[in-house]
Amino acid sequence: LVMYIHRNSMEKNRLGISVSKKVGNSVVRHRIARLLRESFRLNDEKFHSGWDMVVVARMGAKGKNYSDIESALLHLAKLHGIYEK
């Protein structure tokens, strides 16, 4: 996964998800997007507010389970300094 962040002027965070056709067919791409969206939803209160985030899924995300996707997302957020422990 790759994460890009940008400050917004709102009190809430926004999440954008991009999964290329190179990752797999539509079933695989939508599964990855659903896992990312759900892991963000469940951890949203721990993120600092006022950020736009775009997560780009790479080939390595194919076949991963929920806990792998969630840990990768939280790791990226911690690297950017937008996640409270």
State what each model feature region is.
Residues L1-K85:
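Positively charged, solvent-exposed patches that mediate nucleic-acid binding
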